[in-house]
Amino acid sequence: MAPGYQPPSPEEKEQYVRELFDKIAENYDAMNQVMSAGQWEKWHREFVAQTHFRPGDHILDVACGTGDLTLLDAAQVAPDGKVIGVDISEGMLEVGRRRVAASPYKDLITLQLGNAMDLPFPDNTFDGVTMGWAMRNVASIPRTLSEIYRVLKPGGRFICLEASKPFSRFIRFGFFVYWKTFLPLIDWFVVKAGRQAKVRPYTYLSRSLDNYPFPDQLEELFREAGFVETDYQLLMLGTVAIHVGTKRREG
């Protein structure tokens, strides 16, 4: 464990994650390009291939952050669809609103505060739900999946893009060495969050896979939440995964 670092407890996690992303919001997109070794857009193209959204669909982007997936969703449902993005970080939403305002999809997108574990929408509202790079950060994966299932229309599709634990012990070891060595350095040299800082964003992110399920275990959690037609695709030697599931159709 990084010297002096204490991960947040489940009870503290929501507030910790909110403060963390408020702190890194302005540099978030640039740092993702660096940490992904330039693979960011490629992974997002793979994500788009899994969505199957259509013009006119109403889509929810959970933990939308600065709006990467939100904008990709909007491009698929244009010209008359709608996309709502929710996030617990006002800092991330502020960056996202600037990006949306400069995009051709500004009239299709609404960004608002919202919690993945308590979504402020009625049952059976959305044709599709997306979530990118956030499932590791929720306090309860089962509760989050249950909420997403609830707000999907029957037959609606959920697509989750996330970092992943490789099945291979050799690859997993190398990946964790990279994450747990390189990411904490960003706190020191970019975020200026030293050893005594309460919130150390990239040190936290370097530990966020420690207790995260393997891809097959996450797929099982999808099924336990009610999803059918579940599947996952592994990218980058299994260090990134796209999980999909469909809400059971009525009848």
Curated annotation (Swiss-Prot):
Reaction(s) catalysed by this chain's protein: a 2-demethylmenaquinol + S-adenosyl-L-methionine = a menaquinol + S-adenosyl-L-homocysteine + H(+)
Any GO molecular function: demethylmenaquinone methyltransferase activity
UniProt keyword annotations, A-Z: Menaquinone biosynthesis, Methyltransferase, S-adenosyl-L-methionine, Transferase
Pfam families found in the cross-reference section: Ubie_methyltran
Pathway info: Quinol/quinone metabolism; menaquinone biosynthesis; menaquinol from 1,4-dihydroxy-2-naphthoate: step 2/2
Listed EC numbers: 2.1.1.163
The protein's enzyme class: transferase
Highest taxon in the source lineage: Bacteria
GO biological process: one example: methylation
PROSITE patterns registered for this protein in UniProt: SAM_MT_UBIE, UBIE_2
Binding-site list for S-adenosyl-L-methionine: 66, 87, 115-116
Signal peptide start and end residues: none
Keyword S-adenosyl-L-methionine included in the entry's annotation: yes
Family of the protein in this entry: Belongs to the class I-like SAM-binding methyltransferase superfamily. MenG/UbiE family.
Known function: Methyltransferase required for the conversion of demethylmenaquinol (DMKH2) to menaquinol (MKH2).
Protein name: Demethylmenaquinone methyltransferase
Species of the source: Symbiobacterium thermophilum (strain DSM 24528 / JCM 14929 / IAM 14863 / T)
Gene: menG
